[in-house]
From Swiss-Prot:
Any single GO BP term: translation
NCBIfam families found in the cross-reference section: PRK08881.1
Keyword Cell membrane: no
Native source organism of the sequence: Euglena gracilis
UniProt-recorded name of the protein: Small ribosomal subunit protein uS14c
Keywords: Chloroplast, Plastid, Ribonucleoprotein, Ribosomal protein, RNA-binding, rRNA-binding
Top-level taxon: Eukaryota
GO molecular function, one term: structural constituent of ribosome
Amino acid sequence: MSKKSLIARQRKRIILVLIHSHNRYVYRTNGKDEKSFEKKLRIYSFLQKLPRNSLRCRLRNRCYVTGRSRGYFRTFGLSRHILRDMAHYGLLPGVTKASW
């Protein structure tokens, strides 16, 4: 189980990304399309004033059950430990143990 502070920090970052993603997209596209250097600098200064935690790359994939960030399976949204337990109990439809 991850620390509660790490999970809370992740939630804050998700909210910030959702709030500022449209502004970031608008500033970015306007900055790329702008011809004059002064206007481009002004637009990028607005982009720099946005919070750092509103960047999408700051987010970390975490298990929905435990909050663990390592050993994460994207297709299920679970860590490897929880995935194994749920597969053994038959809670994941279509998942079977490999046998050869």
